[in-house]
């Protein structure tokens, strides 16, 4: 097919003129419209920047959460001996001690539930595990305190 003669030829000059006209139209827009558009864009940018700024701070502060018993050890110490302090090294040792005992009791309770072919570790398995892991009088006190705690939890 032959090109129609009525069509304007697409030349480099024609496309440049179209680009100049588009730029002139953009410049001809009132300043109020541009200011309004900027005002609309700026809050979005600020909102986007603020969480990012906070995010950077959070990234710096964010560490893996290590759960310890230090606060609870300190509270019990103050209940028993209000005028006594504890060094950080002693606190670390106490925390390790509690973690070790917890692991031993949990392992023993898990074994007991497997022996009984039960999928759930109940308070009964925990109680038996405490009796097996802790010696004599300490086991009796631990069982009575545990029973008291479970009763308090279930009733209230």
UniProtKB/Swiss-Prot annotation:
Keyword set, alphabetical order: Acetylation, Chromosome, DNA-binding, Isopeptide bond, Nucleosome core, Nucleus, Ubl conjugation
UniProt PTM: The N-terminus is blocked.
Covalent link Glycyl lysine isopeptide (Lys-Gly) (interchain with G-Cter in ubiquitin), residues: 152
Region: Disordered, residue numbers: 1-63
GO cellular component, as recorded: nucleosome; nucleus
GO molecular function: DNA binding; protein heterodimerization activity; structural constituent of chromatin
UniProt-annotated location(s): Nucleus; Chromosome
Domain of life where this protein originates: Eukaryota
Residues forming coiled coils: none
InterPro entries: Histone-fold, Histone_H2A/H2B/H3, Histone_H2B, HISTONE_H2B_site
Functional note: Core component of nucleosome. Nucleosomes wrap and compact DNA into chromatin, limiting DNA accessibility to the cellular machineries which require DNA as a template. Histones thereby play a central role in transcription regulation, DNA repair, DNA replication and chromosomal stability. DNA accessibility is regulated via a complex set of post-translational modifications of histones, also called histone code, and nucleosome remodeling.
Subunit: The nucleosome is a histone octamer containing two molecules each of H2A, H2B, H3 and H4 assembled in one H3-H4 heterotetramer and two H2A-H2B heterodimers. The octamer wraps approximately 147 bp of DNA.
PANTHER family: HISTONE H2B
Protein family according to the UniProt entry: Belongs to the histone H2B family.
Protein name: Histone H2B.2
